[in-house]
Design a protein with these regions (language model features):
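Short beta->alpha junction loops/turns
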Residues: 59, 177, 242-243, 266, ...
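Adenosine-phosphate binding glycine-rich loop
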Residues: 263-337
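A generic structural signal for alpha->beta connector loops
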Residues: 192, 213-214, 257-258, 286-289
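ADP-ribose/adenylate-binding Rossmann-like module
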Residues: 198-199, 235-246, 251-276
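Short acidic-hydrophobic, aromatic-tinged amphipathic segments that line or gate anion-handling sites
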Residues: 215-220
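Segments forming oxygen-rich coordination pockets for charged ligands
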Residues: 1-214, 231-235, 276, 281, ...
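Short amphipathic alpha-helix with an adjacent loop that forms part of the alpha/beta core around
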Residues: 222-231
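Thr-Gly-centered strand-to-loop micro-motif
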Residues: 170, 175, 238-240, 263-264, ...
Length: 337
């Protein structure tokens, strides 16, 4: 299983684990799900000795019971695996009707200070590399249960071993540092994405205007894309509001295999940009034109920067997960299938 959406929780958990003076902690990992569940396998909850919590494994209905079990795991040092069955319509096992209609298995393990897998994961996040983890949660000896770096030959076993590949945070590059880019940065950071602001205008692309951005790049419009070198895992949106900037940016971006390319503005403006690119000698294929999300965003009736940012991020999320962005009530399959 490859992990994208849980990276924000993981970033916070890893930061706590590799801190200079880490707190004694127990890690709860959701290792398997049968049926419906609020969270999917790989969701984690870190419980420190002072009961500080980082992350989540449910919508809030399992955490109290897990914390009680974590106290026992912390005291004994022995890992534990617990199964929560929420398939009953009258499920009141923990004092609430969970109503998730699923069976989930959670592993609880006491962690040593700065566990090696967390150190490697922190390094790979910084270097934007993937990390393969193996979580053993079954077998005769609980002494070997827990999280480690995956090794060659590891094979997933739903009854004993959960394997996951953790991708680095989703990379979003916003070409344009206008005021409407600010809520887009904030919303993307709420999702744990790595956000780069790029703009030819150095007076706009500043740390004071974009304190949450991970990187800020300035320079001539026809050099910006080459300097950033966005790859196939990068989301990109062009929103400088200046035709003279958008044209060279779009020309450079259309030649790259991006995960997503969006252009702010009406369809007529996008068509004119594409026509001008053809006039300038760019061979624009039907596939390249179809790759361009213009106008950018979902049709949410957005009005104002915050709503436009929501529409843009929602479309990007749908593209990342291969979904059609239709209402869930119109979906015949289970939500997570």
């Amino acid at each position: 299983m490859t992990v994208f959406g849980r990276v924000k929780d993981l970033q916070a958990i890893v930061a706590a684990l590799v801190a200079e003076d880490p707190k004694p902690s127990v890690l709860a990992t959701l290792v398997s799900v049968s049926g419906s569940s609020y969270r999917r396998p790989g969701a984690r909850l870190l419980i420190a000795a002072d009961k500080e919590r980082t992350g989540s494994i449910s919508g809030g209905c399992l955490e109290e019971d897990v914390m009680a079990r974590a106290a026992r795991v912390s005291a004994t040092g022995q890992a534990d695996a617990v199964v929560y069955d929420t398939t009953s319509e009258n499920d009141l096992v923990w004092g609430v009707g969970l109503g998730c209609h699923g069976i989930v298995r959670v592993l609880l393990e006491k962690l040593p200070p700065r566990p090696p897998w967390a150190t490697v994961l922190a390094e790979n996040f910084a270097r934007r590399r993937r990390t393969a983890l193996a979580i053993l949660h079954g077998g005769d000896s609980t002494q070997s249960w827990g999280t480690r770096l995956a090794a060659p030959g590891d094979c997933a076993d739903p009854d004993a071993l959960f394997l996951e590949t953790i991708s680095p945070p989703t990379a979003l590059t916003i070409f344009g540092a206008g005021d409407d880019a600010q809520p887009l940065v904030r919303l993307a950071k709420e999702l744990g994405w790595y956000v780069t602001i790029a703009d030819p205008r150095g007076a706009f692309a500043t740390a004071s205007r974009f304190p949450m951005a991970d990187a800020i790049v300035t320079g001539p419009a026809d050099h910006l894309v080459a300097r950033i070198a966005p790859g196939p895992d990068t989301l990109a949106v062009v929103m400088t509001h200046h035709y003279v900037h958008d044209l060279p940016l779009l020309r450079a971006l259309l030649d790259r295999p991006l995960a997503y390319l969006g252009l702010l503005g009406p369809r007529k403006r996008a068509d004119k940009l594409c026509d001008d690119l053809r006039t300038a000698g760019l061979t624009l294929s039907a596939e390249q034109r179809a790759q361009l999300h213009a106008p950018v965003g979902l049709d949410l009736g957005a009005d104002g920067p915050e709503q436009v940012a929501l529409a843009i991020v929602a479309e990007m999320q749908a593209v990342l997960t291969g979904r059609n962005a239709r209402p869930l009530r119109e979906r015949d399959l289970p939500i997570h299938d």
